[in-house]
A protein has these predicted regions:
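Structural signal for interior beta-strand "rungs" in well-ordered beta-sheet cores
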Residues: 63-188
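Terminal amphipathic alpha-helical/low-complexity segments used for targeting or macromolecular assembly
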Residues: 1-69
Length: 188
């Protein structure tokens, strides 16, 4: 299927070239940006996080955090870079990755296959699942970000929910101009 260039990563996220490639996931160059969320696609978010956590030496020791911060690492490790700010009463489910200078605020819930880039914020009572918060992205309070890519320096308002699950099991349909196109994803 031929996609317009507006759905490609270079068009959607032009400022990403200013960031170190070590701190952000590799977004698709030859297809729509959201294909990174498809667990079966080559170089998916899931595959990148699995590769990152299996070889990552710079994680903080979880014992150095407040006892109110909890970790579920039954399915994989929670990697938190030195320099990330983790506030009390947060919960993490691995595998997930929190970059240097990311901020995870009080009461946040970071679930499996989330990649929180440098200077991104997961705020008070916010939940992130199988998503990417690119550098400087903010879900500051009472947000849900699921199966999504939140762009560089995007700031969500209070209580915003990014979730698009088809209850009938079909894939999510995109509207691009007057066209309706299947995304290939049931959650997006």
């Amino acid at each position: 299927m031929e996609w317009p260039r507006e759905v490609f990563s270079k068009s959607l996220f032009p400022s990403l070239s200013h960031y170190s490639s070590a701190t952000i996931p590799v977004l698709p160059e030859s297809g729509p940006s959201w294909t990174i969320l498809d667990k079966t696609s080559p170089n998916s978010l899931q595959q990148q996080i699995d590769k990152l956590v299996s070889s990552h030496p710079n994680s903080q020791d979880h014992k150095s955090f407040s006892s109110t911060i909890t970790f579920d690492q039954c399915n994989g490790p929670v990697i938190i870079e030195h320099g990330a700010i983790i506030e009390p009463s947060t919960h993490f489910i691995g595998p997930c990755y929190i970059a240097k200078e990311a901020v995870i605020r009080h009461g946040a819930y970071v679930r499996e296959y989330s990649w929180i880039c440098s200077k991104a914020v997961v705020g008070h009572a916010s939940e992130v699942k199988h998503s990417i918060l690119l550098p400087g992205a903010k879900a500051p309070h009472f947000n849900y970000v699921g199966d999504s890519i939140l762009g560089t320096a995007v700031n969500l308002g209070a209580g915003v929910k990014l979730s698009n699950l088809r209850n009938d099991g079909a894939e999510v349909i995109l509207r691009i101009g007057d066209d309706r196109r299947p995304s290939g994803l049931r959650k997006f």
